[in-house]
């Protein structure tokens, strides 16, 4: 389009036409443009001119060119408008792009700031987490230590429980042993009680026998009194005959040895040593050293009343023998118990275990109790024997008094004093006869009283 304008006659706004032939009437163009009505008026005049056709053509071309130029101008204006619009659009697009870039940059800056803030917060969190990790590690270590301490305490408690259980088992075993010992002691106590009952029954039987013996002794005394009466009646008849023989009999009595005097008064009583009963089994002795002295039979010169021992006295001697045998047996049992006591003491010294020592101590206590019971039984039996011996002595004394009364009546007719001869007196007489053949009756009486005072004393 620009090229067309450049080569056109009129030219363009940018560049004028290179070759434009300006006719002579170009000077009158403005007036024509200005006064178109005049052309129409004057047209018939111009038409008659020779250049009229050329002018008309030129005018037509000019009109066309003007029309074209106007079109071009409109087109150019349109283009300018379009360009301005496009420029505005471009500006708007640029502004939008710049705005978008700015927004994107701002967003990036914000994102960077946010990321930096997040990083700082993450770092702070990391430090906190590290601190928390250290704290948790410490807590875990403390918990492990506490756990170990608790486990150790539990193990110690378990050990203590086991020790307590062992102690309980030991105590239970001791209780079982004590129960067994208690059962054994109860059985021994029952056996001892049975033995005591048996011995009490025996003692009752012996007391019954003693009562029977006393009854027999009373019967014998009545018999002796009757015999005295009979003998007194017989002695009155034979008094005259025996007066002559009295002097000879007194001489024979003085010349006789002491064993014959003892035979005159029957058997001597039992003599016991003076001793103390100790509870200690080591010092225990045999309580009786029985020395029974039997006198020999009387020679033929003595009277007929003293020739033989009566059967009642033989029975009493047999009872005394039985009692002495029983005493000896009980003393043997006591000796055996003392031997057992010594053996247990040796075992106690040899052993080291406390349980065995406790058992031996219990056995020793039981033995001591048995020995005490046995000692009491022996003392009771001795008392019974003493009572039996006293009864026997009374019977013998009664018989001897009768015999001595008859002899004194025969030997001392002038009324000398009748001294009752007891078995103890018989013993003193024998001792005095051994020392000196001549003795006084007052001295004999003093010795008799002394012996009665120094009789057997059993300390309990």
From Swiss-Prot:
Q: Where is the composition biased (Polar residues)?
A: 399-410
Recorded superkingdom: Eukaryota
Coiled-coil boundaries:
51-228, 317-384
Q: Where is the signal peptide?
A: none
**Is Cytoplasm given among the entry's keywords?**
yes
Please give the InterPro entries that the UniProt record associates with this protein: Centrosomal_MT-associated, Cep57_CLD, Cep57_MT-bd_dom
Gene3D superfamilies, A to Z: 1.20.58.90
Q: Where in the cell is it found?
A: Cytoplasm, Cytoskeleton, Microtubule organizing center, Centrosome
Q: Name one Pfam family in it.
A: Cep57_CLD
Listed under GO cellular component are:
centrosome; cytoplasm; microtubule
Region listing for Disordered, in residue ranges: 399-423
Q: Which UniProt keywords apply?
A: Coiled coil, Cytoplasm, Cytoskeleton, Microtubule, Phosphoprotein
| Phosphoserine, modified sites | 49
Example GO molecular function term?
Answer: gamma-tubulin binding
Q: What does this gene product do?
A: Centrosomal protein which may be required for microtubule attachment to centrosomes.
Question: What family is it from?
Answer: Belongs to the translokin family.
List the protein's name: Centrosomal protein CEP57L1
Query: Which species?
Result: Homo sapiens (Human)
């Amino acid at each position: 389009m620009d090229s067309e304008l450049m080569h056109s006659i009129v030219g363009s706004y940018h560049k004028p036409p290179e070759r434009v032939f300006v006719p002579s009437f170009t000077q009158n163009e403005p007036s024509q443009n200005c006064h178109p009505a005049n052309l129409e008026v004057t047209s018939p005049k111009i038409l008659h001119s020779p250049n009229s056709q050329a002018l008309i053509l030129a005018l037509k071309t000019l009109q066309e060119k003007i029309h074209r130029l106007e079109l071009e101008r409109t087109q150019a204006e349109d283009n300018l408008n379009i360009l301005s619009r496009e420029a505005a659009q471009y500006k708007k697009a640029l502004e939008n792009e710049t705005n978008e870039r700015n927004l994107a940059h701002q967003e990036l800056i914000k994102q960077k700031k946010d990321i930096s803030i997040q990083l700082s917060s993450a770092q702070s969190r990391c430090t906190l987490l590290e601190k928390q990790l250290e704290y948790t590690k410490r807590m875990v270590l403390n918990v492990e230590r506490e756990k170990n301490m608790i486990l150790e305490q539990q193990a110690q408690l378990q050990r203590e429980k086991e020790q307590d259980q062992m102690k309980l088992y030991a105590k239970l075993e001791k209780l079982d042993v004590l129960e067994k010992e208690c059962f054994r002691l109860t059985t021994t106590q029952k056996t001892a009680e049975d033995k005591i009952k048996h011995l009490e029954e025996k003692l009752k039987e012996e007391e019954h026998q003693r009562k029977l013996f006393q009854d027999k002794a009373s019967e014998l005394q009545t018999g002796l009194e009757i015999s005295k009466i009979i003998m007194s009646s017989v002695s009155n008849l034979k008094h005259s005959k025996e007066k002559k023989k009295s002097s000879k009999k007194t001489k024979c009595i003085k010349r006789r040895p002491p064993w014959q005097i003892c035979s005159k008064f029957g058997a001597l009583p039992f003599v016991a040593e003076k001793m103390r009963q100790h509870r200690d089994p080591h010092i225990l002795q045999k309580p009786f050293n029985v020395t029974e002295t039997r006198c020999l039979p009387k020679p033929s010169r003595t009277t007929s009343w003293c020739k033989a021992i009566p059967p009642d006295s033989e029975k009493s001697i047999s009872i005394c023998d039985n009692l002495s045998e029983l005493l000896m047996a009980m003393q043997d049992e006591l000796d055996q118990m003392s031997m057992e006591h010594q053996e247990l003491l040796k075992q106690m010294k040899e052993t080291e275990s406390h349980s065995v020592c406790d058992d031996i101590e219990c056995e020793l206590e039981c033995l001591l109790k048995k020995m005490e019971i046995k000692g009491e039984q022996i003392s009771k039996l001795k008392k019974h024997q003493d009572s039996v011996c006293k009864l026997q002595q009374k019977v013998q004394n009664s018989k001897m008094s009768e015999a001595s009364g008859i002899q004194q009546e025969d030997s001392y007719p002038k009324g000398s004093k009748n001294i009752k001869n007891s078995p103890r007196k018989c013993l003193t007489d024998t001792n005095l006869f051994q020392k000196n053949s001549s003795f006084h009756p007052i001295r004999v009486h003093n010795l008799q009283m002394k012996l009665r005072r120094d009789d057997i004393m059993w300390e309990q």
